[in-house]
Curated annotation (Swiss-Prot):
One of its GO terms (cellular component) is cytosol. This is Elongation factor Tu. Residues 10-206 form the tr-type G domain. GTP binds at residues 19-26, 81-85, 136-139. Monomer. Residues 60-64 are annotated as: G2. It is found in: Cytoplasm. It catalyses: GTP + H2O = GDP + phosphate + H(+). It comes from Maricaulis maris (strain MCS10). Its EC number is 3.6.5.3.
Length: 396
């Protein structure tokens, strides 16, 4: 059977459900697909279909994630839901499932729980731009005042992690009622209200092609009579022949001009996000550029060597370390296309890090790398992945 063509008529956004175990993330995911399938077409997915998430590998780490898609009148969504807490941690840190926004699910009867807090912190650290809250299982709360208290508590918690707790939308309902097709006033109607809030409140992401040009350099060739060609996959933006570009990272930043772009041995006027290309650089010799640097629009990205990161350290079972590590740990940090050695400093009060932990840590690299917040990396020892991280704050 021929694959259905993906009709890109509506803006697209990636979202996910986050929150404490058993607060109803997967039931809500099922409810959204069912209600929207009826409202605007698409395929309804049952709880069991979503819950038996397949495993995937991202940056050498195995993660179970369920992907569903659905659409509202205004947008098309790709939605991720993870079965276990560890999968969320890994997913958010590796960026395996990029989230433009998330729905935080809180059981109205319990209020915020430890993982609620942890997922909000992770969302803050990895740069999820916007959250919308669904207070679930409202049929288990008899007292209207109790609901208001839980809502206040959730808003305060969000504010304490620098989300706009007072302003972000909170919808209260029952995902199970929606799945079972009963009590529309707390079921289906609330799911539609939630998705209207998501449509309005979660910003449409800027498409990669509209962002400033960036291409990680994978390889460097010298072509006699023509000069130096660097190859790689354009991560974002567009590069046109004749444009000035910068080579950033590892060494001092230099400027050059793109004198040619080729793909599959054909010459192009420009390369754009997603293309695997060779870029011909004017006046740069073979030794003047290396793997690990990036080509970028001038002024759009700068090299840094000190940063704060949120990291997940693999367990022994996942192929990670068997022993803890301490301050002054010196692994390799794999950014985009290359390994760079760095020194880890742990926060005060953190004596050591055990396999399976997720932590905040300070890193100082031996050479600077083109860096910005939200940049993902792998932590490696001798070529084997022992962790994953994301830059949460640049120091210098």
């Amino acid at each position: 059977m021929a694959k259905e063509k993906f009709e890109r008529t509506k803006p697209h956004a990636n979202i996910g459900t986050i929150g404490h175990v058993d607060h109803g993330k997967t039931t809500l995911t099922a409810a959204i697909t069912m209600v929207l399938a009826e409202a605007s077409g698409g395929t309804a997915k049952g709880y069991d279909e979503i819950d038996s998430a397949p495993e995937e590998k991202a940056r050498g780490i195995t993660i179970s994630t369920a992907h569903v898609e659905y659409e509202t009148a205004n947008r098309h969504y790709a939605h991720v839901d993870c079965p276990g807490h560890a999968d969320y941690v890994k997913n958010m840190i590796t960026g395996a499932a990029q989230m433009d926004g998330a729905i935080l699910v809180v059981n109205a009867a319990d209020g915020p729980m430890p993982q609620t807090r942890e997922h909000i912190l992770l969302a803050r650290q990895v740069g999820v731009p916007a959250l919308v809250v669904f207070l679930n299982k409202v049929d288990q709360v008899d007292d209207e005042e109790l609901l208001e208290l839980v809502e206040m508590e959730v808003r305060e918690l969000l504010s304490s992690y620098e989300f706009p707790g007072d302003d972000l939308p909170i919808v209260a309902g029952s995902a199970l009622a929606a799945v079972e097709g009963r009590d529309d006033h707390i079921g289906k109607d609330k799911i539609l209200e939630l998705m209207a809030a998501v449509d309005e409140y979660i910003p449409t992401p800027e498409r990669p092609i509209d962002q400033p040009f960036l291409m990680p350099i994978e390889d460097v060739f010298s072509i006699s009579g023509r000069g130096t060609v660097v190859t790689g996959r354009i991560e974002r933006g567009v590069v046109k022949v004749g444009e000035e570009i910068e080579i950033v990272g590892v060494r001092d930043t230099t400027k050059t001009t793109c004198t040619g772009v080729e793909m599959f041995r054909k010459l192009l006027d420009q390369g754009q996000a997603g293309d695997n290309v060779g870029v011909l650089l004017r006046g740069v010799d073979r030794e003047g550029v290396e793997r690990g640097q990036v080509l970028a629009k001038p002024g759009s990205i700068t090299p840094h060597h000190k940063f704060v990161a949120e990291a997940y350290i693999l367990t022994k079972e996942e192929g990670g370390r068997h022993t803890p590590f301490f301050t002054n740990y010196r692994p390799q940090f794999y950014f985009r296309t290359t390994d760079v050695t760095g020194v880890v400093t742990l926060n005060e009060g953190t004596e050591m890090v055990m396999p399976g932990d997720n932590i905040e840590m300070n890193v100082e690299l031996i050479v600077p790398i083109a860096m910005e917040e939200k940049l993902r990396f792998a932590i490696r020892e001798g070529g084997r992945t022992v962790g994953a991280g994301v830059v949460s704050k640049i120091i210098e």
